[in-house]
Amino acid sequence: MAIDKTIIPPSEATEVAQAGHDYVNGILPLSNIFPVKSNEGSWITSWTPVIPKSKTRAMKHRALDAEIGHTKSETSTAEIHSGLIPLSGMDHISERDLTSHVNDTSYLHDKAEGKFEALGQQAGVTEEIERLQALVLGKVTVKENGADVQYSFGRPTAQQNVAPTVKWDDNKSNPVKDIEAWVKIMRKNYGRKPHAVATTGKVIDALRTNEFLRTQLSGMDLEHSKTYLSRDEVLGLLISQNGITDVLLVDEAYEDLKLDNTFNMDADVATVFPDKTFILLPSFNDSTLGATVSGPTAEAQNSEYEINKKVNDGLIGAMLTHQAPLNYDIWVNGTFVPILFEAVSTFKADVLA
């Protein structure tokens, strides 16, 4: 097996694969929460979780010429280090393709180009699925092709899979009070105040007949209140009473991409982000909350590939030839892992029965 540089050189293949990835990354909903961040060519990534600061004592006065005892100054810091793992894909141009297009390098180039772009997009899909894992579970688990790795981001137990006092598909529930209580838990654990929510259309629809919200909207008793609120009215009440400024309906965001014929992600989002999920977080545009860390590849630093990247990160692409039988492999390789830096500033509740 050898690198083919005549049909589509690795430098061009790399650009095509990266462009496919970047297109998908730019339109998928969680790319703002976990923006791609270069790991500057290193296989080891690190981040500092939020930990309580030590108490700062008051200094004491003394009389002139009087001695004073020693005090102990304390600092609180911690850094987590974790190794990255490759994210790879391979496609194929078969012997049958070659015999049907003898010496047609233009055909082979175009076919290879399409496959490099598709593999780059597939890398973006994998990253998005793992971002969903990070947000919902507070961890990312990879168990495939010899890799058996779990990245755990330390979300406090009191902020994971929490049930409201009364499930929200019960009209007697009080979502405003539940959210207020959850924010207090987050702050007690040194998390930041949330101003964004990631949930589903089913959760919002369940609240459209909620008695507390109906009376809050009307300012009157149930008898004189609307029996069925609009989604905008539900969202408006949550926004006005809980300091929420942005709500993402995750299930519908992917569905809209599909129905608008923009992009159809081949993934069961409902399995990764169940209908009952309600997540509080600081913002959808907060670069300190998380990132999709992009590490190095062996190919990018191998002179034979002639890729010549200034920084060893992102995807690479290469067309590999086999002589017996004659065919080609389309190879795309990279290193990407989403990291939730501030898990303590996120809260995940299961709000429906």
Describe each model-derived feature in a short phrase.
Residues 26-45, 117-147, 289-312:
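Contiguous N-terminal and early-domain "leader" segments and peripheral loops that mark the onset or edge
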Residues 70-73, 143, 220-225:
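Glycine-rich loops and low-complexity Gly/Arg-rich segments
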Residues 1-43, 339-353:
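N-terminal alpha-helical "arm" segments
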Residues 214-353:
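Sequence/fold signature of self-assembling virion shell proteins
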Residues 79-156, 174, 178-203, 326-333:
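Long, contiguous amphipathic alpha-helices that act as assembly "spine/axial" helices in icosahedral shell
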Residues 30-98:
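Assembly/oligomerization interface modules of large self-assembling protein complexes
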Residues 4, 14-21, 25, 31, ...:
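Generic detector of well-ordered alpha-helical segments enriched in charged/polar residues
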Residues 148-241, 246:
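Extended, solvent-exposed, turn-rich assembly/linker loops in the middle of proteins
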